[in-house]
């Protein structure tokens, strides 16, 4: 299961991580976000030790999503070595996400 990240823990958990980090930006009211949750949780289990998978509620943590220009959710961002590497917007299929992650890291 993916852990939560907040505005205050983002720097330590994402930018200073030794592992690549996948961040799922979501909100409670977002239907596609809820559909993506089990996919993100499966990816978190499958890539454990290879990629850190985190979730950020944009309503509870508005600063980081604003800083990264997030305008639609779900938005999935991949970070490596403290830098944003790539972004996917909208509901994604598990296999396409895994391919994207593996190509990006």
Curated annotation (Swiss-Prot):
InterPro entries: Thioredoxin, Thioredoxin-like_sf, Thioredoxin_CS, Thioredoxin_domain. PANTHER family: GEO12009P1 (PTHR45663:SF11). Gene3D superfamilies: Glutaredoxin. One of its GO terms (molecular function) is protein-disulfide reductase activity. The keyword tRNA processing does not apply. The gene is trxA. Disulfide bonds join 30-33. Pfam families: Thioredoxin. The keyword Electron transport applies. Component of the thioredoxin-thioredoxin reductase system. Participates in various redox reactions through the reversible oxidation of its active center dithiol to a disulfide and catalyzes dithiol-disulfide exchange reactions. Belongs to the thioredoxin family. It comes from Rickettsia felis (strain ATCC VR-1525 / URRWXCal2). One of its GO terms (cellular component) is cytoplasm. Keywords: Disulfide bond, Electron transport, Redox-active center, Transport. This is Thioredoxin. Residues 1-105 form the Thioredoxin domain.
């Amino acid at each position: 299961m993916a852990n939560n990240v907040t505005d205050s823990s983002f720097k330590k958990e994402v930018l200073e991580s030794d592992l690549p980090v996948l961040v799922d930006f979501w909100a409670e009211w977002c239907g596609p976000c809820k559909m993506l949750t089990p996919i993100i949780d499966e990816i978190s289990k499958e890539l454990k030790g290879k990629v850190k998978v985190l979730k950020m509620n944009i309503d509870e943590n508005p600063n980081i999503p604003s800083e990264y220009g997030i305008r639609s959710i779900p938005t999935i961002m991949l970070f490596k070595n403290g830098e944003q590497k790539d972004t996917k917007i909208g509901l994604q299929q598990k296999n396409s996400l895994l391919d994207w992650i593996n190509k990006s890291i």
